Amino acid sequence: MRLTQMPSEFQKALPVLEKIKEAGFEAYFVGGSVRDALLHSPIHDVDIATSSYPEETKQIFPRTADIGIEHGTVLVLDGDEEYEVTTFRTEDVYVDYRRPSAVSFVRSLEEDLKRRDFTVNAFALDETGEIVDLFHGLEDLEKQVLRAVGVASERFNEDALRIMRGFRFQASLGFALEPETFKAMKTLTPLLEKISVERTFVEFDKLLLAPFWRRGLASMIESQAYDYLPDMASSQDKLNRLFDLETDFTFESSEQAWAALLWALEIENAQSFLKSWKTSRQFAKQVQDLLIILALRENGELSKRDCYRFDIDLLLQAENLRQAQGKEVNPQAITEKYQSLTIHDKKEIQINGGILIKEYGYQPGPDLGEILTEIEFAIVDGELENNREAIHAYLREKK
């Protein structure tokens, strides 16, 4: 099969392919970018595979960087563009179900493609637009099927993260998992405990943000993979609550997706849960804030102080999630209340602790903090104007 129209992303990278071929080596576009081109989907990263060894690749191009040379990858700088150029390779026995004990560089494209995870990710594309399809990936693409390359159990034993990647690809593509492939995934889910939490988080996060997240999540639940994810053992019934969200709902952000997950799991302490997933503190705080906003909305409308406390983006994401839960929402009222606030940060207050100490004789300590907080909320509540004269009058009354 030949592409009738080479996508612009590939056209831009053609000079790199051509230089490698002029030097006497093979070179192809490979991986997800080729699949996306066939599906007429946006192309993100253009990866190149070649028969040239890393040192040979570096001799072809004047500007390169070693970013993973032990695995055969050289970063080629071409004008303003950067391309990862990786030598065809085979991989030895995997250790810890995560990484090969050794990588061997080879001159054979077929040997390289054999180690790929799924047939729809095992294409190669040459400079003429010809598709190299050694594992019937085009047929699987047509049938919308995710099938492991070769023996499925071997692929997942090599790198157990491929199990999560399978669920994630199902969520992003909407494809069905081929029965033998899914059977192997279900059998080998205990291996997920061998995978770093950070890598697992990335795949689960991409699954939740994908357009067909329901399909990927349903397969993950059926496989009982959740039993081997941090703090999610025996959570099938609770995870199924996510399917109660509106049928066409997709998550706006990672924070919203994980807030929904914790809502489904009935977990109130996001910081503790997400610490197990080794996320950033900032991410955990925003997820926690979303859960707090959802809880506040269960008790009625948000107050001015509520709107002041949280970022408007989080307030609206929480409202969006409430709508997906089938609850009454009023994003316009929340936006108007937020915009009506005199201040959105205490740094905007026209006085500070230094002024209170200098002009009013306050001493550093709890009393100073209390009066500053009192002023802050009086301004937020609309009871006090945010100017020095009004604040001074307020303080004189207090004195």
From Swiss-Prot:
Where do the annotations place ATP binding? G32, R35, R116, D159, R162, R165, R168
Extra information = A single active site specifically recognizes both ATP and CTP and is responsible for their addition.
Q: Which residues bind Mg(2+)?
A: D45, D47
Cite the binding residues for CTP.
G32, R35, R116, D159, R162, R165, R168
Name-wise, this protein is CCA-adding enzyme
Give the reactions, separated by semicolons, that this protein catalyses.
a tRNA precursor + 2 CTP + ATP = a tRNA with a 3' CCA end + 3 diphosphate; a tRNA with a 3' CCA end + 2 CTP + ATP = a tRNA with a 3' CCACCA end + 3 diphosphate
Please name the gene that encodes this protein: cca
Q: Which Pfam families match?
A: PolyA_pol, PolyA_pol_RNAbd, tRNA_NucTran2_2
Q: Which GO terms describe its biological process?
A: RNA repair; tRNA 3'-terminal CCA addition; tRNA processing
* Gene3D superfamilies listed in its UniProt record: 1.10.110.30, 1.10.246.80, 1.20.58.560, Beta Polymerase, domain 2
Record note on quaternary structure: Homodimer.
Q: What does this protein do?
A: Catalyzes the addition and repair of the essential 3'-terminal CCA sequence in tRNAs without using a nucleic acid template. Adds these three nucleotides in the order of C, C, and A to the tRNA nucleotide-73, using CTP and ATP as substrates and producing inorganic pyrophosphate. tRNA 3'-terminal CCA addition is required both for tRNA processing and repair. Also involved in tRNA surveillance by mediating tandem CCA addition to generate a CCACCA at the 3' terminus of unstable tRNAs. While stable tRNAs receive only 3'-terminal CCA, unstable tRNAs are marked with CCACCA and rapidly degraded.
PANTHER family xref list:
CCA TRNA NUCLEOTIDYLTRANSFERASE 1, MITOCHONDRIAL
Q: Which HAMAP family match?
A: CCA_bact_type3 (MF_01263)
Q: Which residues constitute the signal peptide according to the record? A: none
Tree of life domain: Bacteria
UniProt lists the family membership as follows:
Belongs to the tRNA nucleotidyltransferase/poly(A) polymerase family. Bacterial CCA-adding enzyme type 3 subfamily.
Q: Which NCBIfam families match?
A: PRK13299.1
This protein's UniProt keywords: ATP-binding, Magnesium, Metal-binding, Nucleotide-binding, Nucleotidyltransferase, RNA repair, RNA-binding, Transferase, tRNA processing
Instruction: List, in alphabetical order, the Gene Ontology terms for molecular function in this entry.
Output: ATP binding; CCA tRNA nucleotidyltransferase activity; magnesium ion binding; tRNA binding
